[in-house]
Amino acid sequence: MAQSKRVKAITAAVVPGKTYAFEDAIKILKTATKAKFVESIDVAVRLGVDAKKSDQQVRGSTVLPAGTGKSVRVAVFAPAGAKADEALAAGAEAVGMDDLAEKMQAGDLNYDVVIATPDAMRVVGKLGTLLGPRGLMPNPKVGTVSANPGEAVKNAKSGQVRYRTDKAGIIHCTIGKASFDDEALKSNLQALLLDLVKAKPATSKGTYLQKVSVSSTMGPGVTVDQSSLSLK
């Protein structure tokens, strides 16, 4: 019932078809936020791509300058030595090779991000059926296969988010918490959009950033006027 009231409040405050300056859009969301937990602020970006074509799928990662507000647990596959030490020093919760793989196969999968050095992928490859369905399989496109595991761990813990177009060519991503101030949320959204522009497929035609909408957890979206953002 409470959620229904909140959705109605946001819907009532939004004029159909209108775009809102970022600050106004966030104000609408925050005013209607009544949940007992700190809600996330999410963004949906409709891109001018044909997601059915492999050369127009957009996938990557962005380090949000103001972070995500979430605590991130990281596991790293790296051979013993400098790379493993580097990952531990950066704050990884677990580092290993076959020993770490065995722990995961035994059920130790309480991680938000799994990172691997290129030479550790021979071990990680055996865990595809475990990590793949959970979205944890390391991938160079999103920076989780890296020759610099320490840097990758720091990125993951400091607010790195991963994105990928869905079947409709839309990117869904979290840009922070409702408790963040407006400037922090704005800087995070701008960083994401700038990286999306850099990732624009060469074969994409017409308007690329077609629509940007922000919403609170499980709430309806409010369309953002892109001219209220700094995208250069």
UniProtKB/Swiss-Prot annotation:
Xref: InterPro entries: Ribosom_uL1_bac-type, Ribosomal_uL1, Ribosomal_uL1-like, Ribosomal_uL1/biogenesis, Ribosomal_uL1_3-a/b-sand, Ribosomal_uL1_CS
One GO cellular component term: cytosolic large ribosomal subunit
GO biological process: regulation of translation; translation
Gene Ontology molecular function: rRNA binding; structural constituent of ribosome; tRNA binding
Transmembrane recorded as keyword: no
Complex and partners: Part of the 50S ribosomal subunit.
This protein's name: Large ribosomal subunit protein uL1
Organism: Xanthomonas euvesicatoria pv. vesicatoria (strain 85-10) (Xanthomonas campestris pv. vesicatoria)
